[in-house]
Structures are given as structure tokens and as C-alpha cells.
Amino acid sequence: MSDIENKNENLELELEDNTILSNLFGINDRNLSLIEQINQVKIQYRGNKIKISGNKKSIFETKKTILNLFKEAQNGAEIDEDRIRDNKSLISINTKTDKQME
């Protein structure tokens, strides 16, 4: 990896519906911890504001994961480890496909 890919960056998100966050974050923030572990990022939040820290690619994938899972939670889905891992797999496949098309 180049120095640019290893450089830590930050991204802030704001999610509009606080009632969904407990489902998204999980009991004792278990879902957030899993997302951090899978994507090798650090996630901090206060209320509906989320800060993601890590390398650029990991931040991008984490943002996509959180937004996808948030939409699923809005539609009534229970967010659990399997759903998080499935979402990560889809994002990884789409990212690889996008790079191949470039």
C-alpha cells in the first residue's frame, strides 16, 4: 500500500432518524464494533452524528455499509451480524467490479 492509502482520514455522517439507530448500532454497540472490525476503522458517534476514521478506502466502504444498513433498518429489517457481513460482501464485490470497469 502506498503512503496515501495508509494515511488516516475522517468522515462525518448525519443520519436523519434517531429511532432507527438503536437497531443499527446494536445492543451495547455490538453492530458498530463489528463494522469497525470488518472495515478496520474507528467509529465514534454522538446522537445521530457519526465520525469514521481510517484509510480512505475503508472509510468509503464503511459509509456505504452504514447507509445501506440504515435503509434496511428503516424498512423494518433487524440488523444483525449476518446482515452486516452480507452487506460487506456485496460492497466488496461492487467495488472490485467498479475497478475492473475503469
Positions of PLM-derived features:
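Short glycine-/aliphatic-rich beta-strand segments at the starts of folded cytosolic domains
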Residues: 3-23
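A short, structured beta-strand/loop element
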Residues: 36-44
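Interdomain "pre-motor" coupling segment immediately N-terminal to P-loop NTPase/helicase cores
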Residues: 44-102
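Structured loop/turn residues at secondary-structure junctions
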Residues: 16, 27, 54-57
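Short amphipathic alpha-helix segments
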Residues: 20-37
